[in-house]
Each structure stands twice: as C-alpha cells, then as structure tokens.
Amino acid sequence: FAAVSVDCSEYPKPACMSEYRPLCGSDNKTYVNKCNFCNAVVESNGTLTLSHFGKC
C-alpha cells in the first residue's frame, strides 16, 4: 500500500487551466485537475486529502 499524495506547495493559484486530469478527494468529490484540488486543499486548511487519482 503506497500513500497517494499531490504536492500543493505552490498553491493557491487564482486561476486554473481547464485540463481534465481528475482526482478524487477525501470528501468523495471529483476534482477536474490538480489545480482545482490543491485550491480546495488550501481552503480546507489541509483537512482535504487525495483519495486516489481518477474520478470518485
């Protein structure tokens, strides 16, 4: 079992590109890409984590 993680150190960003590379958050919500996910992580004060890559 390997921990799944994403480096969000350069976030938040004011605007995200529209590339579609889905990630599934610990809130069971599918995020369109790393940028959208990382912005949500920052907003959650680090309580949101990555569940897995791909749609939930």
Curated annotation (Swiss-Prot):
Disulfides per UniProt: 8-38, 16-35, 24-56
PROSITE patterns given in the database record: KAZAL_1 (PS00282), KAZAL_2 (PS51465)
Cell compartment(s), UniProt: Secreted
Chief location: secreted
GO MF terms, alphabetically ordered: serine-type endopeptidase inhibitor activity
Glycosylation sites: 45
Keywords: Disulfide bond, Glycoprotein, Protease inhibitor, Repeat, Secreted, Serine protease inhibitor
PANTHER family reported in the protein's UniProt record: OVOMUCOID-LIKE-RELATED, SERINE PEPTIDASE INHIBITOR, KAZAL TYPE 2, TANDEM DUPLICATE 1-RELATED
Domain Kazal-like: 6-56
Cited InterPro entries: Bifunctional_prot_inhibitor, Kazal_dom, Kazal_dom_sf, Prot_inh_Kazal-m
Recorded domain comment: Avian ovomucoid consists of three homologous, tandem Kazal family inhibitory domains.
Gene Ontology CC: extracellular region
Domain of life: Eukaryota
Protein name: Ovomucoid
Site (Reactive bond 3): 18-19
Pfam families in alphabetical order: Kazal_1
Species assigned in the record: Colinus virginianus
